[in-house]
Amino acid sequence: MSSKPTQAFSLKTRQAVDEDALLTEEDRVVKEATKGEDCTTRRRACKNCTCGRAELERKMLAEGKKVEMPQMPAGGCGNCAKGDAFRCATCPFLGQPAFDNTSDGKVKLNLTDDI
């Protein structure tokens, strides 16, 4: 089975459309990929840390200083309490369960039996 390249056709003129003519200069600019994960939302540096946090922690431990956990920033989208399905990509609460927004991020478990 051979695969032929597909062509786009105009519905009005039934002529082949030049796909390169549809792109603007802004579309042609190669955008730099954003880093998906980093150490800012974790208690310790990642195993494969590339941001420099692992070196900083080792240096502080060698000097005898306490490594302080960074403060978790409040999310800007307002959906942090709803759960991962509603959180933005940079949410500091990714991976954590949904919580009641009025209880300072503490998780309330419903331990009652539903039978």
From Swiss-Prot:
Pfam family, one: CIAPIN1
GO biological process: iron-sulfur cluster assembly
InterPro entries in the cross-refs: Anamorsin, CIAPIN1
GO molecular function: 2 iron, 2 sulfur cluster binding; 4 iron, 4 sulfur cluster binding; metal ion binding
Region named Fe-S binding site B: 77-91
Region of interest: Fe-S binding site A: 39-51
Cofactor: [2Fe-2S] cluster; [4Fe-4S] cluster
Gene Ontology cellular component annotations, sorted alphabetically: mitochondrial intermembrane space
Region annotation Disordered: where it falls in the sequence: 30-115
Residues annotated as binding [2Fe-2S] cluster: 39, 46, 49, 51
Keywords: 2Fe-2S, 4Fe-4S, Cytoplasm, Iron, Iron-sulfur, Metal-binding, Mitochondrion
Ranges that cross the membrane: none
Cellular location(s): Cytoplasm; Mitochondrion intermembrane space
Entry similarity comment: Belongs to the anamorsin family.
Protein role: Component of the cytosolic iron-sulfur (Fe-S) protein assembly (CIA) machinery. Required for the maturation of extramitochondrial Fe-S proteins. Part of an electron transfer chain functioning in an early step of cytosolic Fe-S biogenesis, facilitating the de novo assembly of a [4Fe-4S] cluster on the cytosolic Fe-S scaffold complex. Electrons are transferred from NADPH via a FAD- and FMN-containing diflavin oxidoreductase.
Assembly and interaction partners: Monomer.
UniProt remark on domains: The C-terminal domain binds 2 Fe-S clusters but is otherwise mostly in an intrinsically disordered conformation.
Protein name per UniProt: Anamorsin homolog 2
